[in-house]
Every structure is written in C-alpha cells, then in structure tokens.
C-alpha cells in the first residue's frame, strides 16, 4: 500500500498553483511517501559465528522476519546436529525482543549421505541444502568436486523429501574466464541436473547474468527460482574500479556487464514469481577487505530494504516490490507468508561510513552515500 501524505499549505488545495514572479519559484506543498508491505524475508544470508555473529544478526533481525542462513562456517555445517547447534547460537545472539526466525541449511559435500537429508527434514529447522562447487567462494574448499558422480543418491533423496537445493552457480575450472563461470555452470551442470531430476526444487543463488535470467524463466514455475542481491541490481563491474580499486564492491560471483544488470532489474521488476530477495549479505572486518588479498563479500543487511526500494522506485515498479521481498520466497519454499508489516518512508538519509564493533570495523555497501528510502523503526 502506497500512501501520499500532504502537509497543510494555505495557498494550495483546490486552487491553482501561484507563481512568485519576483523569484520565479513555485509555491508548492511538501510530500512524503510511505510504503507499507508485508515484512520481508532474506532467502540468502551469511551470519558468521562468534563475535561477528553477535555484531551483525541484529541488523538482519531489525528488518527481516526470517532468513535462510548459509552453512559455510569453519568447519562447515554439514550435519543436522551441527545446524541445530548453530541455530541455538544465533538465537542467543538475537536481541531479547526479536522474533527473527533463522532457517538453517546444510553444506553439501562429496560425503553427505541420504540419511542426513531425512534427518534434516525431520528436524523442523533445516530448510535446504547448499551446493558449493569446491573452491568457488568463501569457505567452499570442502564443497562438491563431482556432483553427478558423488552426490546423486543424496539429490534423489532430496526429491523424496521435497528439500530444495541452493546452488552457487559457478564452475571452478581455472581455464574459464571468471566472468563466464555462471553461464558455463548453467550449460554444463544446471541444465543436465534439471533434466535428470526434474522434480528437484532448485534455487539459483545470487544470479548475475542475463543467461541466468533466461534459464530461470525457461523453467517450470515452482521448480526453479532465483535469489537476487542488491549489488547485482545496482552495480556493474565498473564499480570495482572507479576511482581506484574498490574492495567493498568485491563479491562472488563478481559483478558483470551493464547489459546483465539491466536484464536482472527487468526480471525482478516484471512481477515474475520466480525471483525473490536474497541479500547474500556477507560481513568481513574492514582489515580483511582492504588488504593485499581482500575477501569476497558485500555487507548489505543494514540497508538492504532501502536498496531494493531504490531499484523498484527507479524502475517505476514500487507496486511489484512486496511480491519480490515478501511473497515469492515463502511461496517457493511452501511456507506461509508473514502476517507482520513494515513501512518504508521516502526520506533522504546517509548510510553510515562504517559500523564500529569491539573487534573492528565493517564497511557497508554504499557507505557514506545518500539513499531515499528507509524503514520506519
């Protein structure tokens, strides 16, 4: 629901606009826009552990009702028992008044057994299994080396249990250009996987290319979906190099050409049910980003809703925002939509330059920049 709130002005109403000829300025009224939507969920989130977990989880909990929590810790969350323990740590780190619900995932390995999928389904806290091709991204060294050769029985059990597979969609062959790895993954892994197991529910995570958009749109609704990050909607690969090397715009998959960004924006603002919010918010201490070997990951959780609202507002599609942020994700997972609401106000505000914590600093996406939308607290 979009509301336009008008502040009173005696010279405006049913009368015509009056011009002050001496200054040639129009006397007009102040307008404030508010947008109330069903409270969103984040279908791809990194919360880390230890001090970092305690620092960042309140940012996500302040705006999102639920989140699919990534399992790429050290060591990774490869079992249901480990997922239950990790969830307890998250719950302890939440503010006392929070109703945030972390939805856990398992880290798929070459050694994962079908029995683990049955345990995960029975647990009531594990909602998906994450596929990291070994070496594709942060803490993925324990990931899958041969999906069809070593994981097929597990994938077949996932079909039986209606357990979604969340896919980091990049090949890791060093001979393949980093900007082509998503496209090649679709051709060599994802398309054969869908053909072999058409009943497997798959989420292609953090899509970055028009190739991914076209693939998802070609699939049967409800069988393949995609999460989309704010950075891949707002930035292209020029943002990595403008004004010098920009480590806080570095993530995996890397930003792509402008034509790909435009294709993703068009897809998510079209009203398609196949695309939904997944920030891939990935906090790293500033010293680990601004270094000779900077970590991949963009921290967007504190400002994510403002960023998504910016995308939809600029596309003239604010009426499509709620479906993307709040409906498409739970519908795909077969979960109820949230009953709670959140209101966004169009009022300029400045993103903090940095978030300070006892252990160090975290620089958010769009640090120091002005955004137009913000959630009301």
From Swiss-Prot:
It catalyses: (S)-dihydroorotate + H2O = N-carbamoyl-L-aspartate + H(+). Zn(2+) 2 binds at residues 130, 168, 206. The modification Phosphoserine is found at residue 223. It holds the Pfam family Amidohydro_1. Gene3D superfamilies: Metal-dependent hydrolases. Its cofactor is Zn(2+). GO terms for molecular function: dihydroorotase activity; metal ion binding. GO terms for biological process: 'de novo' UMP biosynthetic process; pyrimidine nucleobase biosynthetic process. PROSITE patterns: DIHYDROOROTASE_1, DIHYDROOROTASE_2. The modification N6-carboxylysine is found at residue 130. InterPro entries: Amidohydro-rel (IPR006680), DHOdimr (IPR004721), Dihydroorotase_CS (IPR002195), Metal_Hydrolase (IPR032466). Pathway: Pyrimidine metabolism; UMP biosynthesis via de novo pathway; (S)-dihydroorotate from bicarbonate: step 3/3. GO terms for cellular component: chloroplast; cytosol; mitochondrion. It is found in: Mitochondrion. Keywords: Hydrolase, Metal-binding, Mitochondrion, Phosphoprotein, Pyrimidine biosynthesis, Transit peptide, Zinc. Its EC number is 3.5.2.3. Zn(2+) 1 binds at residues 44, 46, 130, 280. Binds 2 Zn(2+) ions per subunit. Belongs to the metallo-dependent hydrolases superfamily. DHOase family. Class II DHOase subfamily. HAMAP family: PyrC_classII. PANTHER family: DIHYDROOROTASE (PTHR43137:SF1). This is Dihydroorotase, mitochondrial. The gene is PYR4.
């Amino acid at each position: 629901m979009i509301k336009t709130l008008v502040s009173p002005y005696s010279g405006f109403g049913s009368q015509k606009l009056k011009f002050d000829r001496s200054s040639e300025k129009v006397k007009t009224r102040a307008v404030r826009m508010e947008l109330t939507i069903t409270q969103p969920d984040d279908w791809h989130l990194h919360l880390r552990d230890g001090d970092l977990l305690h620092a960042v989880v309140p940012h996500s909990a302040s705006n999102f009702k639920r989140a699919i929590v990534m399992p790429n810790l050290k060591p990774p969350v490869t079992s249901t028992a480990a997922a239950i323990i990790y969830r307890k740590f998250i719950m302890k780190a939440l503010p006392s008044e929070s109703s945030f619900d972390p939805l856990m995932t398992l880290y798929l390995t070459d050694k994962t057994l079908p029995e683990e999928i049955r345990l995960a389904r029975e647990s009531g806290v594990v909602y998906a299994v994450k596929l990291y091709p070994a070496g594709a991204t942060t803490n993925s060294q324990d990931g899958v080396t041969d999906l069809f050769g070593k994981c097929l029985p597990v994938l077949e059990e996932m079909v039986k249990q209606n357990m979604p597979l969340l896919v980091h969609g990049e090949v890791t062959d060093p001979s393949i250009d980093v900007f082509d790895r998503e496209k090649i993954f679709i051709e060599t892994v994802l398309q054969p996987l869908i053909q072999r197991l058409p009943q497997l529910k798959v989420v292609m995570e953090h899509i970055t290319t028009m190739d991914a958009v076209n693939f998802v749109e070609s699939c049967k609704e409800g069988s393949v979906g995609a999460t989309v990050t704010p950075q891949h909607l707002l930035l292209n690969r020029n943002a990595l190099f403008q004004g010098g090397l920009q480590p806080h715009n570095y993530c995996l998959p890397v930003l792509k050409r402008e034509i790909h960004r435009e294709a993703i924006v068009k897809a998510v603002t079209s009203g398609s049910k196949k695309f939904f919010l997944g920030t891939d918010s990935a906090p790293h201490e500033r010293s680990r980003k601004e270094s000779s070997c900077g970590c991949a990951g963009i921290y967007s959780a504190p400002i994510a809703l403002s960023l998504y609202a910016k995308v939809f507002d600029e596309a003239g599609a604010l009426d499509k925002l709620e479906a993307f942020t709040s409906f498409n994700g739970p519908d795909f997972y077969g979960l109820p939509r949230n009953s709670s609401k959140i209101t966004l106000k169009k009022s300029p505000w400045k993103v903090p330059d940095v978030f300070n914590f006892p252990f160090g600093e975290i620089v958010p996406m769009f640090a120091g920049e002005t955004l137009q939308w913000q959630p009301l607290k």
